[in-house]
């Protein structure tokens, strides 16, 4: 691929850009177009021309793409600017039209794809507050908080779904990256195979809306999942198999989300993984969220409740290299070793290379937080505690560190109701390090 750039200034008279489309149609499919710092735009359109950008990297000054008269169709690519505007939002003209021509219908920008640094193409101030360049059927999704101050936005194909079949179809369609769930959907009859998707998906569950799973199915993200909104993902209404399991040596797990690769971001959603179900399966642990390999996990502003694990790392002996970031969220497990005297769990079991917990509340009975498998963790703030089941003394530790994990505690409250004596490990009854395998370490 080629790079088009300039070492001397281009800007003069009507020469504004490295590519200037003055009538006719120009299609750019790849490569890099980088304007000299503090000089010109990357591309402009004049005299009724049409610019089609399918891919590539475009770096401009004030604007990456400017349309004076004509049309720009942006289907892909990455867009940024070096020189910024001096007043108002400094990045607001990254995409821009000549105002009077846009108002007269002579200048337009239509965005159906692409990645934009510090600029939301669906909501910006280029042509006044609330300017939207994104075409119908597409949506701008914030994919990163960096670079400052506005982060990075990506435009993806959007689908609004109202029933189970529409949702299954959207998960299977590789071109649909964003799915909006605006009404209750019952997925209990769908298989886990139908709920497995190979491309990264964003699922936005609107406030007051419930996405209902069954007793034996769950979402599987092979290349990541972003789950947003103020709605609920729930399987607790599904018929519990606890009675059947109690009479059998074969136990099934219940989960909401499995992530085997890519990044998992949960923001604002409530997850309820049957709080009355206390069995693990023969292949998988019961966990609201289970993650493998390098599936980095970020959970913020969320509520996660489960009958066993709320969050569970999978893959021992260094196989799990995830980073886990938990911020401003609530986690609760109702698991106790007295439930069935066979299966139990901490509120969360964290594997991976790095763990950060900040301003979270984690509540358990069997235990709150277990950090294992060589993880390097920092707990900055929050509340971590266990409670006894009514009439019992079954609560264990607020924090348990094992298997060579290292945890640094710089803030937070840790409490447990019972004094555990006879422990051949360091720590207190609330914060405990070490196990029967390899010692872990907690520093306060």
Question: Across the structure, where does each feature detected by a protein language model lie?
Answer:
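FAD-binding core/adjacent interface of flavoenzyme oxidoreductases
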Residues: 236
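Extracellular beta-strand/beta-solenoid scaffold signature
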Residues: 8-22, 35-46, 59-68, 85-102, ...
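Generic recognition of long tandem-repeat/solenoid scaffolds
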Residues: 4, 141, 150-158, 219, ...
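Activation/maturation switch segments at domain boundaries
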Residues: 70, 169-170, 174
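Secondary-structure transition/turn motif
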Residues: 32, 154-160, 248, 383
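Detector for repetitive beta-architecture
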Residues: 1, 23-25, 30-32, 48-50, ...
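Extracellular/surface-exposed low-complexity segments
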Residues: 76-77, 81-84, 88-89, 96-170, ...
């Amino acid at each position: 691929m080629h790079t088009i750039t300039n070492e001397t200034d281009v800007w003069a008279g009507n020469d504004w850009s490295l590519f200037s489309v003055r009538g006719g149609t120009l299609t750019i499919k790849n490569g890099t177009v980088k304007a000299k710092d503090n000089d010109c735009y990357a591309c402009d359109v004049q005299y009724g021309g049409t610019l089609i950008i399918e891919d590539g990297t475009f770096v401009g000054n004030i604007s990456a793409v400017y349309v004076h008269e004509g049309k720009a169709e942006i289907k892909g690519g990455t867009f940024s600017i070096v020189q910024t505007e001096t007043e108002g939002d400094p990045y607001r003209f990254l995409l821009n039209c000549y105002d009077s021509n846009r108002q007269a219908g002579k200048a337009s920008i239509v965005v159906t794809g692409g990645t934009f640094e510090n600029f939301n193409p669906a909501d910006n101030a280029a042509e006044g507050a609330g300017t939207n360049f994104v075409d119908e059927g597409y949506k701008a999704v914030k994919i990163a908080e960096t670079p400052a101050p506005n982060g990075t936005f990506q435009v993806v194909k959007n689908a609004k779904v109202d029933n189970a079949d529409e949702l299954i179809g959207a998960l299977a369609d590789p071109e649909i990256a964003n799915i909006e769930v605006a009404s209750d959907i019952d997925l209990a009859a769908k298989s886990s195979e139908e709920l497995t998707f190979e491309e990264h998906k964003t699922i936005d569950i609107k406030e007051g809306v419930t996405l209902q799973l069954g007793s034996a199915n769950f979402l599987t993200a092979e290349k990541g999942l972003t789950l947003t909104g103020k709605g609920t993902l729930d399987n607790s209404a599904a018929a519990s198999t606890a009675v059947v399991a109690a009479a059998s040596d074969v136990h099934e797990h219940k989960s909401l989300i499995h992530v085997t690769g890519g990044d998992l971001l949960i923001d604002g959603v409530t997850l309820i993984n049957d709080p009355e179900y206390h069995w693990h399966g023969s292949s998988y642990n019961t966990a609201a969220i289970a993650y493998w390999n390098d599936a980095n996990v970020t959970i913020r502003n969320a509520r996660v409740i489960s009958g066993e694990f709320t969050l569970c790392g999978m893959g021992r002996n260094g196989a799990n290299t995830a980073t886990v970031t938990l911020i401003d969220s609530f986690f609760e497990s109702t698991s106790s070793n007295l439930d069935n005297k066979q299966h139990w769990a901490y509120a969360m079991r964290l594997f991976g290379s790095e763990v950060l917990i900040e301003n979270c509340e984690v509540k358990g009975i069997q235990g709150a937080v277990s950090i294992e498998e060589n993880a390097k963790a920092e707990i900055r703030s929050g509340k971590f505690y266990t409670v006894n089941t009514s009439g019992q003394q079954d609560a264990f530790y607020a924090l348990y560190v094992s298997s060579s994990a290292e945890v640094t505690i710089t803030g937070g409250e840790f409490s447990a109701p019972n004094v555990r004596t006879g422990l051949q490990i360091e720590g207190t009854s609330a914060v405990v390090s070490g196990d029967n395998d390899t010692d872990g370490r907690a520093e306060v």
